[in-house]
Regions:
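Phosphate-binding site of ATP-dependent enzymes
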Residues: 143-262, 266
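Short glycine-rich, flexible loops that bind phosphorylated cofactors or substrates
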Residues: 55-57, 135, 300
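Extreme N-terminal starter segment of soluble prokaryotic enzymes
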Residues: 1-4
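Hydrophobic alpha-helical segments and helix pairs
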Residues: 98-153
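C-terminal active-site "lid" helix and adjoining low-complexity regulatory extension at the edge
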Residues: 253-258, 272-273, 285-334
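Conserved N-proximal alpha/beta basic substrate-recognition cap immediately N-terminal to
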Residues: 8-117, 121-122
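Protein kinase-like catalytic core scaffold
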Residues: 126, 211, 233-234, 279, ...
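Generic beta-strand structural signal
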Residues: 108, 227-228, 285
Length: 334
């Protein structure tokens, strides 16, 4: 089998390429952004493309390209089942509800009138989210009905940008203050107050819907579990200081004793039901029981190098280092 790999430095592709070289797997580098990409992969049996939600080009075409090649008979990563809901919290709401999986209660409205009526009838606080964004970007707490109305008015007015300039700056500043970023990173965040990203310039504003989730109090951490081909590993993320969000905090615990096997079991159940090649699942807890917040097919590479082991589907623990990106290649070759 010959694999075509789109190479994006810093992504899964670094380790895919290294693993193919190490194991003597036939591969070629292709450029998914070229108009002739279908021709580029014509002599290959598989195509691998770690597309990113922060690149406007990927948002425009990556899922469509992958699905087209999959329909043409090629093996692809990520395949349609794995990635159609990527960076789409509204899509994930429908998917998890239809699959009967435990999730944080979520609400979506497509008219201002329906949203405002719901606000009058519900309790607060509620968590407001845009359908896209990672690392707690575009996630805010509506403490009161008035705050929720302001989000609704924006969503059905001029809309909201997926890139929050002030939020990005504060994110970098807080990470620097906690030792998780450099001063140069803070300066880059400051520059973004005046210079938007390429994505922000090219992507239209989010409008015409609002999405809320119940706020689950008393969570000092969340658990993220990643499942690839019947193997699972996990991390514990500590909630930010004076905040309710853990994603993107940079405060991570890896010891097996810090992790929760009930989340791992639920993750294996999700993998089985959704037939995904790779899925990262974020959990919070209500009355001691895990609830899914959201999903992703992708994850940052470096933070998981510190994981001390993984589980197999029989819930056996396997101590020691591992290479999840290599698992993805092996899954595609199987």
């Amino acid at each position: 089998m010959k694999i075509a790999i789109h190479n994006r430095p810093g992504s899964f592709s670094d380790r895919w390429i290294a693993y193919c070289k190490e194991k003597g797997i036939d591969y070629k580098i292709v450029n998914a952004y070229n108009s002739d990409i279908v021709d580029q992969v014509s002599d290959c049996d598989a195509f691998m493309f770690h597309h990113h939600h922060g690149d406007y080009r990927d948002v425009l075409f990556a899922k469509q390209l992958l699905y087209s090649l999959e329909e043409a008979g090629k093996k692809v990563f990520p395949d349609w089942r794995t990635c159609w809901h990527f960076d789409d919290k509204v899509g994930q709401k429908y998917l998890l509800e239809a699959a009967g999986l435990p999730m944080v209660q979520s609400y979506v409205f497509y008219t201002k009138e329906e949203a405002l009526t719901w606000i009058e009838q519900t309790s607060f606080p509620k968590v407001f989210k845009l359908r896209g964004g990672a690392g707690s970007a575009n996630v805010k707490l509506a403490h009161t009905a008035n705050e929720a109305r302001r989000f609704v008015n924006k969503a059905f007015g001029k809309g909201l940008s997926q890139f929050n300039r002030s939020g990005y700056f504060l994110e970098r500043y807080n990470k620097w203050r906690n030792g998780n970023d450099t001063f140069m990173g803070v300066m880059k965040g400051f520059a973004r107050l005046f210079l938007p990203t390429e994505y922000a310039k090219m992507h239209s504003r989010e409008k015409g819907y609002v999405y809320f989730q119940d706020f689950i109090p008393n969570n000092s951490y969340d658990i993220r579990v990643i499942v690839i081909d019947g193997k699972a590993f996990a991390i514990k993320r500590i909630v930010r200081e004076n905040d309710f969000r853990a994603s993107g905090s940079g405060k991570i615990l890896y010891a097996r004793s810090e992790l929760r096997e009930d989340c791992v079991r639920c993750s294996f159940e999700l993998e089985e039901k959704l037939k995904t090649q790779c899925v990262a699942i974020d959990f919070v807890f209500k009355d001691g029981k895990p609830l899914i917040v959201e999903l992703s097919y992708a994850f940052a590479v470096a933070p998981y190098d510190k994981c001390v082991g993984y589980w197999t589907k029989d819930m056996q623990w396997h101590e020691g280092p591992f290479n999840p990106e290599a698992w993805i290649v092996d899954c595609l070759l199987a």
